[in-house]
Amino acid sequence: HNQSRRQRQMCIRDSPFTDHPYIFELAATHGGVADEWHTDITFQDQPSIMSILHMVKCPEVGGDTMWTNLEQAFDELSTPMQQLCEGTTALHDAAPHSRPDIMAIHPVVRLHPETGRKSLYVNEHFTRRIVEMNVTESDAVLGYLTGWVKNPRFTVRYHWTPGTIAIWDNRCTQHFVLNDFEGERVIQRVTVMGDQVEAAAQPVAQPWVREGRKSATSRYDRQMRQYFRSRDQEAVDG
């Protein structure tokens, strides 16, 4: 579909890469430090299954990567909060890549296609809005969830050495880099593309879009209207 093609092209065009078209090389001195919790490219309709990272150069001290277990984070929510999350979806966009027009809507709780386990699927880097809530409610719930997944008991921290390779499942984890180092840090990354995200439950309400006069908070409503218009137009275009 057209939007998916644009998303793939954007990723390739806007990311530095080596001579191999599917290996992306990122250097800290050129802004390549992912120091915000995230799951890779959730702004795509079919986000990545997994990522493979090769550490080319790293500082002796600092620059560790942390991962958090989103299945455990969901399991340890209270039952009412689990039920609230399972009945909602969220809008993700590529604003950190200067492309806020590239958007996708995914369930807040997804099912792992191989294990059947449920996990939270929102992150502070790409997730903008819970679709079925107004802006104030969405900000409160997203703020809680994105803070909750950082709980130390869900996380692991790894200190790199040159030549190390890490592989992780993007369907049930988030990660981030501790930006606490000086000097250069160079990684090479391969991202394995995925399938449609499967929801743990169907949404319990229609999208909440504020109509009428514009306000400071209505930018999210305009963004959602843009998303739904684009989706409807793509359906018409076939």
Enumerate the predicted regions with their spans:
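Single conserved hydrophobic/aromatic residue that forms the stacking wall/gate
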Residues: 1-12
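Short, acidic/turn-prone active-site loops that include or flank metal/cofactor-
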Residues: 15-17
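Active-site environment of non-heme Fe oxygenases that use a 2-His-1-carboxylate facial triad
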Residues: 19-155, 159, 165-167, 171-238
